[in-house]
Amino acid sequence: MRVTGLGHASALIETRYGRILTDPWVNPAYFGSWFPFPDNSGLDWDTIGQAEYLYVSHLHRDHFDPEHLAKHISKDTRVLLPAYATTELRDRLEDLGFRHFVETVSDEVHELDGGLQVMVQALTSPTDGPIGDSSLWVSDGQHTVLNQNDARPGALDVFQQLGPVDAYLIQFSGAIWYPMVYELPTRAKQALGEPKRDRQFDRTLRYIDECDARFVFPTAGPPCFLDPDLWEFNDFGDDPGNIFPDQSVFLAWLAEQGHDEGRLLLPGSVSDLALTGAPVTHAIDPASVFGANKPVYLKAMQERRQPEVEAAKATWAHPEIELLPALQEWFHPLLAESTRMAAGINGGIRIVAHDTDRGDIDLLVDFVAREVRLYDGEKVRYEWRTQRAYLEQLVHEHEIDWVNSLFLSCRFSAKRIGPYNEFVYTFFKCLSEERLNYAEGWYEEQDAAVAAETIELDGWEIQRRCPHLKADLTRFGNVDDGKLTCTMHGWKWDLASGRCLTSVGKDIRAARLGEPVPVGAPAEHPAVDTPDERGQHDDEVD
């Protein structure tokens, strides 16, 4: 079995029974902000696209590239389809001309032609990807690959039951807008970015230790930013708070932790798992893209590819769209159906759309009155600003996932009072009736099924499953001075009160050893009016 790197989360897994192409992404994503690093546009995609199988893990645009899929990937390929709660991924692929699908069942092994075995684990909470993220396990009877990309399973036990893993592909770098877009002083952003970066590495190491694979291939990041407006987000090694460290930085850190199984995959790199040590042959000299040469490399890449962004920018403004009535028509039915999310937000979100020539539009999405109206000085906890053209483009395309478009573009600024609120994030990725109803139902089920199982941790008895996304706290829980941190995403709780310090509506059941643990969910606590303790949702949400 051979694994060929194709850039970011994309790889070609070559087995004796056929080839699987994963997450091919080439074109700029998220309002032209993200590009694969290093540049993979020069690969022979027409040949690569003849693979027998295609796996698109989820609908994030750095994994799902519709333009590239339509142009370069054979429509005769068989698509390995995760078992998501909605049909959006299949619908999008069918719109591109794909017709042959392998409908997988999450956590079940499927045997394909000739004996090739695959298993796709689908994660389906509202905060997993755009209503879904997934991992792919592949075995040809001789070697095994686990491609986790940027999925965050609570544990890897389902995969471990299938035997040792030879190659483990896993995300390690940031994929989010936090803390860069927040309206804070530079030093404050650096202070928030450093623990975020540390958590990314620590979380990845926990997965690596749990998987215990023969070889580890850090993938699925980081992107690079070629637009001059976003250039500062690239990591050139001079900012310890930068959340986008590259593969060379992570592999050096991994070696410092005593791990020698790390392997570097660049676009065109090939690792043969059948050879001793799984040596990697590179098509690109790593020294030419990392370290001191990285700024030079990115400047040259910017010269080649920034025209793609400029061409896209020219299409975003839609002066014919009247934003207020358009958003009222779109949002009002959703707000009327939103129960859990509206209660969780319990206030207004201010949205300011700037335009120097045409004038600004200042809007309020009111989750109490369930309406969109012009902002009139109301006190709000949550506020974000962007360009009017970007908001018009979202309306023009009827983009139902603003997280997977504008927010990940980092082409906005934000501020808030108090802690991160998961319901704000979830609402803006659920701007369709189907998505919103799914998310509302998911929250309803979680509240109704509070787990009774508890664990003992550093003098406390605590519910075993994290209230956020059900991570096993025996693996991911750390207690320090009465504060619990779930290192899966960095969420924090005050154990004495059970109060979540990171978001609202996610309290925990806990008591000191020897005292009774609350049977139901703790009483709700009022929202915090002061800045949180920066147990920031690690992925707001990456």
Q: Where are the predicted features?
A:
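Zn-dependent metallo-beta-lactamase
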Residues: 1-42, 433-455, 540-541
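Active-site metal-binding motif and surrounding structural segment of the metallo-beta-lactamase
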Residues: 33-81, 161-191, 403, 480-485
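Feature captures hydrophobic
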Residues: 271-465, 472-476, 484
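Pre-active-site segment of Zn-dependent metallo-hydrolases
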Residues: 16-59, 66-71, 128, 152-164, ...
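Metallo-beta-lactamase
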Residues: 82-143, 245, 252, 261-265, ...
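Rieske [2Fe-2S] iron-sulfur-binding domain
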Residues: 65-68, 445-525, 529, 537-542
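Cap/insert and terminal regions of metallo-dependent hydrolase folds
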Residues: 80-81, 156-258
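Catalytic core of the metallo-beta-lactamase
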Residues: 5-16, 110-166
